[in-house]
């Protein structure tokens, strides 16, 4: 069972929605944010270092203070307004002809602590602390986390009915070509029914936003400890999530590039790979992995298919069967001596949204020596790992499209 509730979203008026909404804070650097930010962009609130000349340290106190100042200013200017009543919201994203429909809601921090909200990645304390400062200072969840829930026919029917019979509040296409629409569910009975249905759902799954989720839980614990009259119903107990049916989500590949071959020549590397893989030379045309345990390698201007031989992985091990684990064990560790993906300076990671061409570019430029493309993890694999309490290796999942920040915001202000 999970506890959710509708909320009074702080959000832009319709005419400013496309300008206020921005990419999330963690997918662009400060220089990119400064270049992208228009006058009303939420980037001034989630990347406030861009308002300093030169760009300031994003973890400095003046920058944290600027975020609070800007959030207040956006509300006083009318670029962000709070809805008069609590609602759920349908947030639809369209990418390359495929649409996924999520529900914007508030989730209870105690469900994360109890394990009803399940994670699949480790978090870093320094990143948690940074997100905590933002939530604590703003008394709001400015950016949502991205959750998945087991497919539910009744929720699907409710969403379909609202979408069919109501015009969207927002309907815009972002600069990356992805479409974003928002519907407000104003019918109280419908909102009540959504709450009831989710009370019967055994778990939610963190897809993207592990640090924001962990930070929200820590803020909830802090507020609970500091409030002698705590009831568990306070607004600070809840944090903002957009939650999608798992069956609608697609994980795309998250690939690897390496700076050296650990002293091997390309020919020696190929020979060593043949101990664990069936190796096929695919020539100069891009080659994309065709199935689980099939990898693509780009080396010295040529593409290769690497298929792990039987017995090289354990189908009964939810972590060992992952292609990121197979590649790490059989290639990165065993051959290239790259032991820790989190700390090694000899490896970098490239989201599949950039395409195989980005892997080729980085190798051809001389920056990297070889590239490896992986077959994407499935949502069912993610759920299996979360359900068994396991943790995925670093840089395993990449979700697209990303949620736009600023479409809806959750404020702790209950007035």
Task: Give the predicted meaning of each segment.
Residues 1-415:
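Surface-exposed, charge/polar-rich loops and edge strands
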């Amino acid at each position: 069972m999970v506890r959710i509730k509708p909320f009074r979203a702080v959000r832009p008026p319709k005419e400013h929605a496309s300008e206020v909404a921005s990419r999330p804070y963690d997918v662009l650097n400060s220089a990119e944010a400064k270049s992208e930010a228009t006058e009303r962009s939420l980037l001034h609130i989630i990347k406030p270092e861009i308002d300093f000349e030169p760009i300031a340290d994003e973890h400095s106190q003046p920058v944290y203070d600027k975020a609070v100042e800007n959030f207040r200013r956006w509300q006083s200017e009318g670029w962000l307004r709070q809805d008069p009543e609590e609602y759920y919201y349908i947030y639809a994203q369209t990418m390359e002809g495929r649409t996924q429909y999520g529900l914007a809601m508030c989730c209870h921090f105690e469900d994360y602590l109890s394990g009803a909200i399940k994670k699949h990645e480790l978090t870093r304390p320094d990143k948690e602390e940074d997100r905590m400062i933002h939530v604590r200072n703003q008394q709001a969840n400015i950016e949502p986390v991205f959750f998945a829930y087991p497919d539910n026919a009744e929720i699907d029917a409710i969403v379909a009915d609202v979408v069919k019979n109501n015009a969207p509040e927002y309907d815009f296409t972002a600069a990356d070509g992805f479409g974003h629409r928002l519907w407000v569910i104003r019918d109280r009975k419908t909102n009540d029914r959504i709450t009831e249905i989710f009370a019967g759902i055994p778990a939610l799954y963190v897809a993207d936003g592990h640090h924001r989720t962990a930070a929200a839980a820590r803020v909830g614990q802090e507020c609970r400890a500091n409030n002698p009259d705590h009831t568990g119903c306070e607004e600070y107990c809840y944090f903002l999530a957009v939650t999608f049916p798992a069956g609608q989500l697609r994980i795309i590949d998250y690939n690897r590039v390496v700076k050296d071959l650990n002293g091997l020549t390309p020919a020696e590397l190929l020979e060593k790979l043949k101990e664990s893989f069936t190796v096929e030379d695919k020539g100069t045309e891009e080659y994309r992995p065709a199935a689980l345990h099939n990898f693509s390698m780009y080396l010295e201007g040529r593409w290769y298919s690497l298929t792990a031989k039987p017995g090289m992985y354990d189908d009964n091990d939810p972590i060992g069967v992952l292609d990121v684990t197979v590649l790490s064990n059989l290639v990165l560790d065993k051959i290239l001596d790259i032991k820790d993906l989190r700390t090694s300076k000899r490896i970098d990671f490239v989201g599949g949204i950039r395409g195989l061409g980005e892997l080729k570019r980085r190798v051809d430029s001389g920056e990297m020596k070889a590239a490896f493309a992986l077959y994407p993890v499935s949502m069912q694999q993610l759920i299996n790992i979360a359900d068994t309490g396991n943790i995925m290796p670093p840089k395993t999942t990449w979700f697209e499209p990303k949620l736009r920040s600023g479409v809806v915001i959750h404020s702790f202000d209950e007035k």
